[in-house]
């Protein structure tokens, strides 16, 4: 029996002065489109470490996680399904510089985001933030 199980991934919401950190993808899928710093968990790390590592690799910034924003199951990536853990974070060090699979990074006002946004889950998260909706992880597990 073969199972197609989702893999763990992390994304990070980093805000600064009412602007949000986004990365333009330098590789496919969604080449040239913008999204949150994110990536798949490696076997020897926690999901929190994944979030910190991916943000550093993609943006040059060192972050501190400040909270758990949401968890989504997604099939946005044609390569594999994922369980996406979305964290909130603040910058503690580093210089903003694209790296890894991003060719440009920057902070954008929520009311002036790039037109081409990668991944449906990123669009959902950013639309909620634009509406002022915060979805910190619920204390009640019922929807």
Residue ranges and their predicted role:
Residues 1-20, 71:
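Conserved N-terminal beta-strand and adjoining loop/helix that marks the start
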Residues 24, 69-72:
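Short hydrophobic alpha-helix segments
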Residues 41-65, 72-128, 135-139:
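Unchanged
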Residues 7-9, 15, 29-31, 36, ...:
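Short connector loops at helix/strand junctions that flank enzyme active sites
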Residues 5-7, 25, 101, 118:
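Surface loops and adjacent helix of pleckstrin homology
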Residues 19, 134-135:
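Generic structural signal for secondary-structure transition and capping sites
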Residues 15-57:
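Conserved Nudix-box catalytic region and its N-terminal flanking loop in Nudix hydrolases
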Residues 142-143:
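Short, charged, surface-exposed hinge/linker loops at domain edges
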């Amino acid at each position: 029996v073969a199972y197609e199980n989702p893999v763990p991934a992390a994304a990070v919401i980093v805000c600064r002065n009412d602007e949000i950190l986004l990365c333009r993808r330098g590789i496919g899928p969604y080449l040239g489109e913008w999204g949150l710093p994110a990536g798949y968990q490696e076997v020897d790390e926690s999901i929190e470490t994944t979030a910190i590592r991916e943000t550093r690799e993609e943006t040059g910034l060192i972050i501190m996680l400040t909270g758990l924003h949401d968890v989504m199951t997604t099939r946005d990536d044609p390569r594999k399904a994922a369980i996406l853990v979305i964290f909130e974070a603040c910058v503690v060090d580093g210089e903003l510089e694209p790296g890894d699979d991003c060719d440009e990074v920057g902070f954008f006002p929520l009311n002036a985001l790039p037109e081409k946004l990668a991944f449906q889950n990123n669009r959902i998260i950013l639309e909620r933030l634009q509406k002022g909706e915060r979805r910190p992880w619920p204390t009640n597990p019922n929807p």
